[in-house]
A protein has these predicted regions:
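Glycine-rich phosphate-binding loops of nucleotide-dependent enzymes
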Residues: 1-165
């Protein structure tokens, strides 16, 4: 699929009039323009050709397209599961910047990650789980990464205030 096709999957725009209504022809120019605008808004200017196949993109660019797709259509929340896994340092940086940009637009993000530096860099709150259950909720400015890891491993027990959160 092209980048534009990927962004519009399940939300394709039809041509106006009889061609779209009866013959169900897609309005590709409108889809491409919208996709280009949304990628540009999020600073994904490294993607030159909107008709480029997604599988030819780098891992960071693919994640960027996925984030742009979620942000472009007024999602109430964006859920990202290990968005920086298997990415290089530069690509991870770019994905974290995209997360900040989307969050700045007022869209809540649920980030599932084992990469503690990334979590502490972008999170407002961190839900720590241990043995399949939520153990506590902490704010990154109040705790260190070492504290968070200690909670996860059971080396440290959170205070009652964090557990109740």
């Amino acid at each position: 699929l092209s980048i534009a096709d990927n962004m519009f999957m399940g939300r394709e725009l039809r041509k106006p009039g009889i061609m779209g209504k009866w013959f169900r022809q897609l309005d590709r120019p409108a889809m491409e323009k919208f996709a280009r605008e949304k990628l540009s808004e999020l600073g994904l200017m490294t993607i030159q050709n909107i008709n480029q196949a997604v599988e030819t993109l780098s891992g960071g660019q693919r994640q960027g397209v996925a984030v742009a797709r979620a942000a472009a259509f007024g999602s109430k929340v964006v859920i990202l599961d290990e968005p920086t896994a298997a990415l290089g340092v530069k690509e991870s940086r770019r994905v974290l910047e995209l997360i900040r940009d989307v969050r700045a637009r007022g869209i809540p993000i649920i980030l599932i990650s084992h990469n503690m530096p990334h979590v502490f860099e972008v999170a407002d709150r961190i839900h720590i789980h241990r043995l399949g259950s939520r153990l506590c909720v902490i704010r990154p400015q109040d705790y260190s990464m070492s504290d968070a890891v200690a909670f996860m491993t059971g080396a440290k027990v959170p205070e009652a205030a964090e557990v109740a959160a």
